[in-house]
């Protein structure tokens, strides 16, 4: 009986860790629960000096066991460029693969590392002005880490993105801190605070972009969450007319597989 109680407590603690919720703007190494097979969609408003861009991605991951995940992500894009008519259409398509490399679990905590591969297929429309698609094949390989406890979660991602057709290659680096604002319980009904940074260093042109991010995430059940966040540039080495004022994001994740 005592062994059964200990096992039950361990299962509930691990489930609560998974139910904490993934970071809004950074990848997670957790491949189960709300980070597992399902659907994620969100609206993203990018307000620049010379344009307003709306992006509506749809990502569908699918788990091949507990340590491997594949998926596909598409996006609808609308661009309102100053002094031009607005253009809209479907952007590039991304296939992704996640593979767990390391896992160490403790009571109410876990540390994990995964490798993630993103392959961009440039199917987006490029005949319009401005262009909807990138017209560039892109391959990105990154390492994603996460240390998640019942009280907080710390996430990081470092990767390199190879591009074609004259676009600059870039090094990506992301970090996030997730803090539950309500006591942990099961089934989950939680409110999480997300803060972090998201950066890109464009190696071919030696320019850097760093966004500070913050957001709120509401987990309504073990199969659904809603989230909203804002990103503000703190470093952006681009021409003034192309600078970003802020980025607003709101969306949902639903576990369906």
Predicted regions and their residues:
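Outer-membrane pore/translocation modules
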Residues: 78-170, 243, 257
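Residue-level detector of the transmembrane beta-barrel scaffold of outer-membrane proteins
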Residues: 38-40, 69-71, 96, 112-116, ...
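Hydrophobic, lipid-facing positions within transmembrane beta-strands of outer-membrane proteins
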Residues: 37-41, 54-58, 91-95, 113, ...
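Outer membrane beta-barrel transmembrane domains
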Residues: 176-257
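Transmembrane beta-strands of outer-membrane beta-barrel pores
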Residues: 43-47, 74-80, 101, 119-123, ...
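Solvent-exposed loop/turn segments connecting transmembrane beta-strands
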Residues: 46-54, 81-88, 135, 162-172, ...
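Short loop/turn motifs that connect adjacent beta-strands in outer-membrane beta-barrel proteins
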Residues: 27-35, 51, 67, 102-112, ...
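Short glycine/proline- and aromatic-enriched beta-strand/turn motifs that initiate or cap beta-hairpins
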Residues: 19-61
